[in-house]
Design a protein with these regions (language model features):
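Hinge/capping helix and adjacent helix->loop/strand transition within the periplasmic-binding protein
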Residues: 2, 25, 49-58, 72-156, ...
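A ligand-binding cleft/hinge motif common to bilobed small-molecule-binding domains
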Residues: 65-76, 134-142, 168-201
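Membrane-helix entry/capping segments
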Residues: 162, 267-274
Length: 289
C-alpha cells in the first residue's frame, strides 16, 4: 500500500486532487493507494509528517504550491530538496478575487479606485502562510488599499464575505461559482498566470495587465532516500492517467474547472521553484503575520 499524505482537510481542491490521484494510481499501478489527511498550519503539519516518514516507498506527500508559502513563512524549516520529487500532477486554473455585490465594484481597477477613495476601509481575507497569503500581498502591491484579515480556510472565507465581515476574498473558482452565478459575489479576475480555458467568463488579472499571479500546482514527492525508481514509476503512471484517461479529465473539469496538467520530475520541480522566485520578496511579510 502507498499512503498519500494530503496536508489539507477533506473537502477542498487539494483533497480532491489527492483522491483522484489515489483512485487512478490504484487502477494504473495495480496496488492500493490511499489518502491520509493530515491537516494543520496551512499545510505545514502534513508536509513535516511526510518528510519524517520512512523512505521505504510506503508514503508520499501530495501537496500544492502552499508548500512554498509554508517554507517562506517559516511554518516549515525545509524545502523541496528534502524530498525525491515525482511530478506535478495537476494545476488549479487560478483562484478568483471576489467582492460582495453590495460593494458596487465590478472590475479590479474599480476596486483599486474605490480603495484609494476610502483608505483603510476595506478588509481582505486570506489564510496565513497559504497561497492566498501570497496573492493578497500581490493585490496590495497592485494598488489596493486593504487591511489583511486571517480568516482561515476556504469555507470560512466564503462565510466571512457573505456575512459582510470582509470585503474581498481569494478562493478557488469551484468553491465560489454558485455565489458568482447567484450574483451574491462579483468576480474581478483569476490569479493563475494565464486565462483558464474552462473558465471563459473571467480573465486572469495578469492578462488584464495587473501583476497578480500565483499558479497553484499539485505535486507528488517522496521522503528523501526513497529508491528513485519509485517516484519515476509513479510519475509515468500519472502521465498516462493525465494524458489518456477521459474519465479523469471529465472529473477534474466538472469539479474544479481544471485542465489535465503534467510536468515530469525535474521540469515539475523547476516550475515550483519559478513560482517561489515570484514571491520570495514577501518572505518578511509572511513571517511577520
Amino acid at each position: 500500500t502507498l499512503q498519500l499524505i494530503c496536508p489539507f482537510a477533506a473537502g477542498g481542491d487539494s483533497d480532491a486532487n489527492a483522491r483522484w490521484a489515489a483512485q487512478y494510481l490504484t487502477q494504473e499501478m495495480g496496488m492500493d493507494v490511499v489518502v491520509v489527511n493530515t491537516d494543520g498550519n496551512g499545510g505545514a503539519v502534513g508536509a513535516r509528517a511526510a518528510k519524517d516518514s520512512p523512505n521505504d516507498g510506503s508514503v508520499a506527500l501530495i501537496s500544492s504550491s502552499a508548500f512554498i508559502t509554508n517554507e517562506l513563512s517559516g511554518a516549515i524549516d525545509f524545502g523541496l530538496d528534502e524530498f525525491e520529487f515525482s511530478c506535478i500532477c495537476a494545476e488549479n486554473p487560478g483562484n478568483i478575487v471576489c467582492v460582495n455585490k453590495d460593494l458596487g465594484v465590478n472590475t479590479f481597477q474599480e476596486l483599486i479606485d474605490y480603495s484609494k477613495a476610502n483608505p483603510g476601509k476595506l478588509k481582505m481575507a486570506y489564510n496565513s502562510g497559504a497561497t492566498t497569503h501570497a496573492i493578497a500581498l500581490q493585490i496590495i502591491d497592485a494598488g489596493v488599499d486593504a487591511t489583511l484579515v486571517d480568516a482561515g480556510g476556504s469555507s470560512d472565507r466564503i462565510a466571512a464575505l457573505l456575512g459582510g465581515h470582509v470585503d474581498i476574498i481569494i478562493n478557488s473558482f469551484g468553491s465560489v461559482k454558485d455565489y458568482l452565478q447567484s450574483g451574491d459575489f462579483v468576480g474581478l479576475g483569476l490569479t493563475g498566470d494565464r486565462d483558464a480555458e474552462n473558465i471563459p467568463d473571467y480573465k486572469s488579472l495578469k492578462e488584464q495587465g495587473f501583476d497578480v499571479a500565483f499558479p497553484t500546482y499539485f505535486f507528488i514527492a517522496f521522503p528523501k532516500g526513497t529508491d528513485p525508481e519509485l517516484p519515476k514509476k509513479v510519475s509515468r503512471a500519472m502521465k498516462n492517467i493525465i494524458e489518456n484517461n477521459q474519465e479523469y479529465a471529465a472529473a477534474i473539469k466538472d469539479a474544479y474547472m481544471q485542465s489535465p496538467t503534467y510536468y515530469d520530475g525535474e521540469k515539475g520541480k523547476q516550475k515550483l521553484l519559478e513560482s517561489r522566485e515570484e514571491i520570495i520578496k514577501y518572505t518578511s511579510a509572511f513571517q511577520s503575520k
